């Protein structure tokens, strides 16, 4: 964490930023090692960083934080600390009202966004971060296999989701990384078809998309199955998505752009005549947030680098018929890509 702070301070020097105010919880955790439930804020002044927390969070923050911790009773104390700051570095997510309050109550003259330097830091994972994500992926692998076993004719989607979310917690997850998607039948054509009260029927395609939050880091995996035997159309679109996903994983490597990686899977799906049914980007970064940089899309020119963790998740979604998505969390390595989620992909 010392190295992270040093890079932030260097950015401040290069951009004539006097102080930095960090409020987004995942960024507070990234720089301090703690994420107070009741709120916490980091102020960087010169090369010194301090974590400010409400009184009720003080004892826990003191135990966990790698930064000095100071408690406050009223936010006015924060305004006072930042009084007469010429240039304040802030995150783009900071609310308009808080910016206005800093102008009025702290007399801040100018604001500069610090999102780019934080993105550049967080986009490359350390060895320790990768090990945590690998554990989160291990939990997700166990959960997706349990979901496959749980899915039977007549069972409600929510029943399956509840059981796998319980299993993830029993295996060490803090909670699901996001609302578990169990989307069956016509609902499998909904990319974000979170589990509903719909009963699963024989012949349904079922998209299972889940992830585990473990020690603050996320995992993400999707598998698609059929209840019973697949028909010709279901098998066709499954094989196309599987080919696109495998080819993209095999091709991913440092030096290529996110756009180039997206196009590998997208062109395969287009060649089979289903380009209009692949309606989202190929993937996204995974880390402290379930969706973070880079965006693996047809518009993103980000160059892939060793240490990035991304998802590769092509899909085909045909309204009224159903959909197929196959997704893995993948680590970009020196020589290519390594699947961190390892559940069998050939499930039809």
Swiss-Prot record:
One of its GO terms (cellular component) is cytoplasm. Pfam families: Creatinase_N, Peptidase_M24. It catalyses: Xaa-L-Pro dipeptide + H2O = an L-alpha-amino acid + L-proline. Its cofactor is Co(2+); Mn(2+). One of its GO terms (biological process) is proteolysis. Optimum temperature is 100 degrees Celsius. Highly thermostable. It comes from the Archaea. Keywords: Cobalt, Cytoplasm, Dipeptidase, Hydrolase, Metal-binding, Metalloprotease, Protease. PROSITE patterns: PROLINE_PEPTIDASE. The keyword Transport does not apply. SUPFAM superfamilies: Creatinase/aminopeptidase, Creatinase/prolidase N-terminal domain. Splits dipeptides with a prolyl in the C-terminal position and a nonpolar amino acid at the N-terminal position. Belongs to the peptidase M24B family. Archaeal-type prolidase subfamily. Homodimer. This is Xaa-Pro dipeptidase. It comes from Pyrococcus furiosus (strain ATCC 43587 / DSM 3638 / JCM 8422 / Vc1).
């Amino acid at each position: 964490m010392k190295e992270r702070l040093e890079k932030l301070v260097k950015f401040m020097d290069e951009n004539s930023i006097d102080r930095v105010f960090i409020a987004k919880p995942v960024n507070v955790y990234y720089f301090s090692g703690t994420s107070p439930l009741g709120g916490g804020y980091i102020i960087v002044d010169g090369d010194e960083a301090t974590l400010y927390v409400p009184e009720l969070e003080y004892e826990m923050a003191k135990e966990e934080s790698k930064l000095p911790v100071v408690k406050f009773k009223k936010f006015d104390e924060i305004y006072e600390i930042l009084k007469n700051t010429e240039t304040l570095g802030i995150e783009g997510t900071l609310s308009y009202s808080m910016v206005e309050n800093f102008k009025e109550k702290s007399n801040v003259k100018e604001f500069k966004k610090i999102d780019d330097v934080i993105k550049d830091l967080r986009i490359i994972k350390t060895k320790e971060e990768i090990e945590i994500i690998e554990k989160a992926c291990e939990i997700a692998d166990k959960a997706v296999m349990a979901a496959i076993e749980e899915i039977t004719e007549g069972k409600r989607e929510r029943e399956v989701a509840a059981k796998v979310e319980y299993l993830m917690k029993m295996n060490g997850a803090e909670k699901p990384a996001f609302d578990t998607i169990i989307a069956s039948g016509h609902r499998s054509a909904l990319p974000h078809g979170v589990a509903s009260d719909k009963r699963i029927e024989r012949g349904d395609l079922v998209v299972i998309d889940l992830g585990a939050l473990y020690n603050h880091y996320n995992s993400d995996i999707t598998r698609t199955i059929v209840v019973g035997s697949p028909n010709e159309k279901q098998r066709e679109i499954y094989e196309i998505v599987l080919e696109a996903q495998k080819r993209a994983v095999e091709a991913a490597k440092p030096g290529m752009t996110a756009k180039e990686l997206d196009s590998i899977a997208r062109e395969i799906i287009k060649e089979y005549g289903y380009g209009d049914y692949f309606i989202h980007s190929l993937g996204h970064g995974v880390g402290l947030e379930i969706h973070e940089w880079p965006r693996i899309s047809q518009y993103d020119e980000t160059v892939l680098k060793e240490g990035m963790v991304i998802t590769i998740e092509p899909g085909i979604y045909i309204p009224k018929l159903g959909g197929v998505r196959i997704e893995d969390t993948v680590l970009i390595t020196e020589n290519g890509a390594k699947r961190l989620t390892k559940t069998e992909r050939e499930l039809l």
